């Protein structure tokens, strides 16, 4: 595993899929544009990208949040080259378990 590896997306967690499929068409378009962007990046590029806002979740090692659109953040984990999408949140605080 290297930070120079291309990012691979794993969108197969049922709780993530449920929220993703509930999005309206406009929001789906924005989120999928971010998925397309992520597939073109290496891990180092993800860490440096200011628009994605990759952040560690406090007190949860190995768990991070990433901005998918202006409205939505996802909670993700990294497994080798894979970014595993766990949950999707409308609000910033929800992604950090604060609500």
Please describe what each predicted stretch is.
Residues 3, 7-14, 33, 42-44, ...:
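Alpha-helical context
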Residues 31, 35, 46, 50-53, ...:
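Residue-level detector of alpha-helical recognition elements and their boundaries
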Residues 37-66:
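A short, surface-exposed loop/turn module that caps and links secondary-structure elements
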Residues 26-29, 55, 73:
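Residue-level marker of intrinsically disordered, low-complexity segments enriched
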